[in-house]
Amino acid sequence: MSKQAQSRSRKKARKNIPAGLAHIKSTFNNTIVTITDLSGNVIGWSSSGAVGFKGSRKSTPYAAQMAADAAARSAQEHGVKKVDVFVKGPGSGRETAIRSLQTAGLEIGSISDTTPLAFNGCRPPKKRLV
């Protein structure tokens, strides 16, 4: 097989998906934004680290904004216009990521918090002495 034909077959096919789901996982150290179709297949994703932030800068709201913007752009290439948002975690980039999805041009249908809560599970980390 020639090199040109081989590279053409590797390119991802562009789907036309009008609606999807946006999963925002915001931890104390990072923010991951994943956009899927309605059945859960990943269309596009991004994270604070993938955008180019390292170390403690990954946990900032600005890094979450940039990650959400990059994920929204990759989803819009597949034709996504409307998303339902699921937010998980206690991080600082939760609201900023949602706002950034809106300003990127995605219409937000609903926002739901899916943060897991322990019913007396593992002992949480001790408070920091700063």
UniProtKB/Swiss-Prot annotation:
UniProt cross-references to PROSITE patterns, sorted A to Z: RIBOSOMAL_S11
Keywords tagged on the record: Ribonucleoprotein, Ribosomal protein, RNA-binding, rRNA-binding
GO biological process: translation
Record's keyword annotation contains Ribonucleoprotein: yes
Molecular function (Gene Ontology), one example: rRNA binding
GO cellular component assignments: ribonucleoprotein complex; ribosome
Function statement: Located on the platform of the 30S subunit, it bridges several disparate RNA helices of the 16S rRNA. Forms part of the Shine-Dalgarno cleft in the 70S ribosome.
Known partners and oligomeric status: Part of the 30S ribosomal subunit. Interacts with proteins S7 and S18. Binds to IF-3.
Family the entry assigns: Belongs to the universal ribosomal protein uS11 family.
Name of this chain's protein: Small ribosomal subunit protein uS11
Organism this protein belongs to: Tropheryma whipplei (strain Twist) (Whipple's bacillus)
Lineage start: Bacteria, Bacillati, Actinomycetota, Actinomycetes, Micrococcales
Gene this chain is encoded by: rpsK
